[in-house]
Structures are given as C-alpha cells and as structure tokens.
C-alpha cells in the first residue's frame, strides 16, 4: 500500500494592501475622517483580530500585509486614536437608539451594532490603546505575517522623477522601521505601478521583492505561477493570479454580491446603519429583505469552501502543466474589502486561512514563497499597474492631465528650492517636502478618474499644491519669519513622518 503524499499541491500567498490617504484634519463627512473611522472599525480591528487569534494558536506565515506609512501614521496618532474612541462612542449611542424601535428586525440590528461597538471600544481600551504599532509588531515579530512597506504617501511611482521616487520610498521604509523595529524587505508598489528600472532603486534601498499585476508579468512572457527576478537585478516580482483573485472580487462580480450578505449601499438613514441583505443586485434598496446573520454565516462557509476548491484546483492544474512541479498562486486585495465593503469578509478570511492547509495547500508569505523556490527569471517587465486597462491611464489620463502637469511643476520647483544645501535640519524645508509628498498621493488622480468623491480629491490636490508653492515662495525670498509661521501651521494639520529630512532629497539623484 502506498501512503498518500503529504507534500502540498502548491503554494498560496494572500496579500492584503492596507491604505487610505492622509485624511486627518481634512473634513469629516462623507469623505474625510469618517472614511478612516469606518475602515478602522469595520476592517482594521476585525482583520487584525483574526490574525492575532490565529497567531495565538501558533500559526505562522498566514499572509503578507501591506501597511502604507501614511495610514500607519494616522492609526498611531494619539489625536486620531482619541477621535476614533469618540466616534465609537457615538456608534454605541446610535445602536442604543434602536432599542425601542417598533420593527423587531431593527431592534435586532441595534443589538448587533451595540455588541460590535462594545467590542471595538474594548479593543481601543486594550491592545489598541497605543494605536496600531503595538498590535502590529507582535504579529511581525512572531512570524505570523510578513509586513510590506512602501513609499511614504503612496505616490504613483512611475510618474515620479528619480530623486522624488527614492526620497519617498526611503522615507516610507524609515517610517515603517520606526514603527515595527525592522526594515521591510518587501514593498507594496502603489497601484502595482511599474516602470522599467524601478527595480534598480528598489535594490539600492534594500527592497528585495514587490508586486505587479498579472498582465505586467504575462506581457513579459512570464507566468503568475512563479515569481521572477527583474531585469539585471536580484529583486523579485510577484504577480497577482487574476483567475483566482477575481473569484472573490472583480469590477463585475464576486462573493460580496451574494444574496445573503449585508448590502453595503442600503442605509437606515435615521441610525446610519445597514439593515438589509443584498437580496439581488436588481432589487431596489427599499425592497431589499432584512439582514439575517445566520444565513450570512452559512454563505460564508459555502464561499470559503468554494474558494479553497478554486485554489486547490488551480494548483493541481498548474502542477500538471509543469510536469509535476508545484506552482504558486498569489491573490491580492485591498484590506478594506474585508469588513468595510464586505461585512462578512473577516469571517470568510478566517475560514479560508484555516481550511487551505487542511486541503493540502501550503499557505505562506511572499518571503516564504521565495524560500520554497517559487522564483524564475530573469524577466524584463514592461510598464503596468493594477488599474483599468492595466496601464497608467487612471493616473495620467485625460481626466487628470491638469493634475499630472501640476505635479510635475511642483516637483521641479521644490527640488530646486531644496537643492541649496543646509548643514542642519530645517523644519521649514522638512514641511515643504512633507506637503509635496502629500500633494503627490496617487489617491487624488484615482478618485478624479473614477469620479469617486472627485470634488474632494481635487480640493485636496489644490490645497496641498497651493500650500507647498506658498512655502516655497517664502523660502526662496528668505522670509524666515513668515516661512516658519506657515510651516508650523501646516505641520499642525499635515504632520506625518516626523523623521522626514529634506536634506536627503537632493542627494537622492
């Protein structure tokens, strides 16, 4: 009798990209701080709770977590931590207001929301009392997750000049190092944006791996079943397997659209809560059925089992195509999908992470995939992104041509102003660099192109540009008093990356 093989059928890597732009002090509703509060309460708390629970069971190499420096700065900010606690308190009050509602389903909704708010408040009084980093660091130290860093304020790197590209990435890596005590070896390249030659700057800054979208690698003759070394470097690129990734969520379909899941778009406007299930995509909001958490939990079990089956079948097929050599599947998503957009997402995530190893699939991180030998190459990749068309059109298309021009002029202007050497750090120059980085965030162009809170995005773009130009004018004129006063006011509102040293920018060339 031959014993069944205990070798895994292949390797699966789940990558979660955790990002929101700098929102602190820039409006509340409907876009602004409210956006971050909701994502914090419904995604970041429950997703990290899932990871912590699995880590306490001794599980390691669960997934790869990208955490952008600009988001981490907000989740660690004592002011924002206090603001979030206040927001959670109002959440609880809103839940209590449903206790006497005449509709039993609304009373049940209030009870669920009250319990959820209690759980969140307890987390903020406990492990999260000091912000994100005290929660994140043990997961990194224990090997439960691999943490990806990235450029400071999430710029679309292919559109940056080399000095700014290196400066933003160095600042971001430094920031993550300060927060978790170790320098990331991998990064999430914002928007999976790639330009040939970026790997050279990655290598120079100690980055050993990054992600691109599947078509970027496939266009170079590669396959998503292997990571590759890029160009003449030793830097490794991983690519999303879109066949598997899109099973969960794509621009047109995915599990969150299932009829039993909570509907994201239907609100009880008096309380602000979501009382309905999807029912069907064609059902008007006022006709959607009440949410049933038990039926939703059953849907989670069904969809988790389906995903495990999809991953396993994909890996079995890859092994057959590769004469028995195990393949790699990388699925990558925004963390905010799990909990915020898809209420049941954290439950599904936990179920999948438990079930995949039982199905004979090796679950690991990007670093673990390298150690397991899933690296081919080299490949010379072409330009790409994970946006519409898999090119750069979202960030350099006609709808945002004026933003692109503004960014180019600002980069050139500030680079010239900061090129004059200074022996000591200057808080005015540091703030000029900081304001410029915030102006260059990829989010503003994305929101305009997608017409998603486009007015807010244009306002943010214009404001950061206006403030940076004014500060540059004062520096050039030598008006140290006015420049110092303006820089201090800006720092009070836009003050992430306190370690930022503008003297490093000219030297990045």
Question: Where on the chain are the PLM-derived regions?
Answer:
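Short, solvent-exposed turn/loop segments enriched in Gly/Ser/Thr/Pro and often Arg
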Residues: 66-71, 151-153, 186-195, 366-371
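Acidic (Asp/Glu)-rich catalytic clusters
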Residues: 6-8, 52-60, 131-148, 177-180, ...
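Hydrophobic, small-residue-rich alpha-helical packing segments that form membrane-like cores
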Residues: 193, 198-207
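CE4/NodB-like, metal-dependent polysaccharide N-deacetylase domain
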Residues: 165-189, 310-323, 327-332
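Active-site and substrate-binding clefts of carbohydrate-active enzymes
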Residues: 2-62, 67-112, 116-119, 222-509
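His/Asp/Glu-enriched short active-site or ligand-binding loop at hydrolase and phosphoryl-transfer sites
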Residues: 208-219, 362-365
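Conserved short loop/turn motifs at secondary-structure junctions
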Residues: 183-194, 334-338, 453
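Glycine-rich phosphate-binding "P-loop"
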Residues: 149-171
